[in-house]
Each structure stands twice: as C-alpha cells, then as structure tokens.
Amino acid sequence: MADPRERVPPGNSGEETIGEAFEWLDRTIEALNREAVNHLPRELIFQVWQRSWAYWHDEQGMSTSYTKYRYLCIMQKAVYIHFKKGCTCLGRGHGPGGWRPGPPPPPPPGLV
C-alpha cells in the first residue's frame, strides 16, 4: 500500500514560495494604497499604518512582514466597508486624498 501522506512536489522547497509571498504582499499593499487614497482620507490611511507599526512591530515585536499583513487586513476591511456603505464614485474615485483636496500622500514608511 502506498504512503497516503502528501509529498512536496519536486522543485518546491518552500523558499521560492516564501519569497514570492513577500513580493505579493508588497505589491498588494501598494495597489491597495493607490486605490484607498481615492476613497479614504489620507490622514486615516497614514494613521492606520502608524498605529499598525507601533502596535504590531514595536509593542508586540512582530516581524515587518506580519505588520504589513495586519495593515493589509485592516485596510481591506476599511475599503470594503466604504464600498458596502454605498460609494458613489462609480469607478472614478473621490479624487486624490479621498474627500480632502490636495495631492495624494506618499506611501507609508517602509513601502517605498
């Protein structure tokens, strides 16, 4: 009888997958920030980043990638709720900076 346990396919040691996951995380955060700045106030986006970093990285001692992941989860929820509540931008966005005038903010620290 054959061994029923799953085996790792050849060529997938896991290290390539982890590197791809970190790249995906960075790309996803950058894309989400570019979209969020059209729908949410800049101050909110920046504060979420600062508080995520202060809590998860500085206070809890979590890794940079985990901190980015938690930030991503919070921002995805914020954008989802914004759309669910009836975003009326119809794909055009609310303009740079959400509801506030001015140019869009720079990306949160550490994401450049």
From Swiss-Prot:
A motif (Nuclear localization signal) lies at residues 65-72. Residues 61-80 are annotated as: Binds to human NUP153. It is found in: Virion; Host nucleus. GO terms for biological process: symbiont-mediated suppression of host innate immune response; viral life cycle. Keywords: AIDS, Host nucleus, Host-virus interaction, Inhibition of host innate immune response by virus, Viral immunoevasion, Virion. GO terms for cellular component: host cell nucleus; virion component. Plays a role in nuclear translocation of the viral pre-integration complex (PIC), thus is required for the virus to infect non-dividing cells. Targets specific host proteins for degradation by the 26S proteasome. Acts by associating with the cellular CUL4A-DDB1 E3 ligase complex through direct interaction with host VPRPB/DCAF-1. This change in the E3 ligase substrate specificity results in the degradation of host SAMHD1. In turn, SAMHD1 depletion allows viral replication in host myeloid cells by preventing SAMHD1-mediated hydrolysis of intracellular dNTPs necessary for reverse transcription. Belongs to the lentivirus VPX protein family. This isolate is from a Gambian case of 'neuro-AIDS'. Interacts with the P6 region of unprocessed GAG. Interacts with host VPRBP/DCAF1, leading to change substrate specificity of the CUL4A-DDB1 E3 ligase complex. Interacts with host NUP153. This is Protein Vpx. It comes from Human immunodeficiency virus type 2 subtype A (isolate D194) (HIV-2).
